[in-house]
Swiss-Prot record:
It comes from the Eukaryota. One of its GO terms (cellular component) is extracellular region. This is Arminin 7246. Expressed in entodermal epithelium along the body column. Residues 1-18 form the signal peptide. The lineage of its organism: Eukaryota, Metazoa, Cnidaria, Hydrozoa, Hydroidolina. Belongs to the arminin family. The modification Alanine amide is found at A83. Antimicrobial peptide with a broad-spectrum antimicrobial activity. Keeps its antibacterial activity under a wide range of salt concentrations that mimic physiological conditions of human blood, which is surprising, since Hydra is an obligate freshwater animal with nearly no salt tolerance. Does not affect red blood cells.
């Protein structure tokens, strides 16, 4: 179940059993904060993994920057036409 649907489901349960509107608001707020904190904890590991990939791509970035784009720009429409015919 997606986190958004889980939050909505919990909000529906809170609406049915709540005594007042303020209780419902506080319950929804607590659940959303909990989900956000869980997502942040999960994302920490992903950001660390991506940093390694960026370092691995450094040689390719250097080669890509050395390309003389002004000399290649006139050939782009020709390459697109040839690719479209195949």
């Amino acid at each position: 179940m997606r986190p958004e649907y889980a939050v909505l489901f919990l909000a529906l349960i809170a609406l049915t059993y709540a005594r007042s509107n303020e209780d419902v608001r506080e319950e929804i707020k607590n659940e959303i904060e909990k989900d956000i904190l869980e997502d942040l904890v999960e994302d920490e590991g992903e950001l660390d993994d991506k940093a390694i990939d960026v370092n691995d791509a450094k040689p390719f970035r250097i080669r890509f920057r050395r390309i003389r784009w002004r000399k290649l720009v006139p050939y782009i429409p020709v390459a697109l036409k040839l690719a479209g015919k195949k």
